Structures are given as structure tokens and as C-alpha cells.
């Protein structure tokens, strides 16, 4: 029987580059505006990409005297499309985020002194959380101040599972109750502009408690030879101690009633020891009937011999002469 899943590969998100650059429209010349850069990630869950508008991001900002402390609030966890106006000669700094395109997150705070955003007690769903902190905007000239540049980073990782089978399509092989257990599903995360540092702190769920759940696969043996579950957005964390559980069930010709087995597999750490923000990971395994029950024996074939070709001789052909 299969004892472990095998990590096939990692798709790396291009966090230091972007494919889209959109300048947010500003209603008036002196209004504070933003331009956004969002790093790429491979398609899977509902992702936030570079095609953004100011109505998609939320902003927290502070300003103060030139060279002094930035302690006066502006943009109090409000949409980037909200209109505020530059104060002549002041310094500004902004923190921004987007929880996918799913709206405001109330548990966010921004430390202007350390250029750090904090997301308290955050639980991923299907939304791609991205965060950014601007450079300090110093000694503003209100009439000519340009848009504030924001380069967003992905705060979460993505993890998916691929199930394969060699079972014939006369059978129904269902995979259900796919879930990650003993992983962190609720945590406090920080993004610090210096070094683009992302950190998360939280406690793992217990044995038998779902940290992240995946969609059931109705029939793996449907003639396509494999079926992929969707990816989930997940808190970045160490992989050690985390496991995946699922229920495999097979029915069909000669199998009455259906055979079912709940399978638990610790995630290997040989190739990947932690899930990093902005990266996508895939685990794959093969499930056949013998992994579900030992009551079934597959039909197998032994090729005893394929005979060699015998020589039948070589015969010359005479070409007829040309007739006059």
C-alpha cells in the first residue's frame, strides 16, 4: 500500500517583478493617488494580480512635519479611492493591502516608524492577501506631487494535491474529505518593508481537526487517468508535523459493497521543509484498489515469449527485357 505522498515540484511566484502597472485615477490634481505593482503568482485560487484599481486596495497612512514624527492619521483603513489631499511641506508614509477583492479586514494596523503592517488573527479563505508599504514621501509640493508607488507582496502560500490512478474506468474511485491537519490556519502576520520581510505566528490545529479542506473528487477513474484538487491559500509555515487525510472509496464490477479506507499521510519534508509566502506547492500520489482494500487482486499478465522472425529465403527477380 502507498505509505507516503511524493512532492513533485514547486512553482515559484515572481515576487520581484510584475506584469501590470496601473496608475490609479485621481479626481483632482492635489489629491493623494496610488500606483500599484502586484507580483505574479500561478493561477489557482482567487488571486489578486496587477490589474488593480484604487477601489481594490485599502490604505492606512500617516503624515507629520518634514523630518519629524509621522503621527497624524490619513487614510484610516479606507479604500485607496477615498479622496484626501496633500499638505504642503509635510512628510507622508502609507501602508496598503488587499484581501483578494473581498473587502476590508478590520484586524490590520500600520506602524509608520518601522514601516510595518500587522494582520491580527487572520484566517485565509479563497482570497489572496497582498501587502505593501510606500517609501516615505518627503517635503511634499502639493500642486505637483505624483502618485504614491506601491509594490505589493503576496502574504500567503498555495498548496494543492494531485491524485492519480491506474484503475480502469469501469470502476468508480472517489476521493473525499481531503483536508490538511495539524497546520496553522489562524495567525497574526506582519509585512515589514525592510527586506520585504513576511512573518506569521499562530498555533496548529489538533489531530482530526481540519486546517484546510479541499473539494471532493467524484471519480478519479473516469478515463482521464488523474484528477487534481484545487489549490488552497495557506498561512506560510514549517511543514514538519503536518499531515493530509482523505477517504478513498472504490465500487464497480465485482465490488459489492463498495470498499472504503480513510488514509492519513504525513507530508514529507525532504524537498520542502516550509511553505513560503508567494510560492505554490503541489503534492501528488497514486491511489489504486489495493491501496483501499486487500480483498481485491488485480488481473495481471505475463508475457512468456514473443517469437523471433524466421528467415523465409531470398529470391531474385528478373526484370523483363524491353520489347522492340
What do these predicted regions represent?
Residues 2-324:
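Sec-type signal peptide cleavage vicinity
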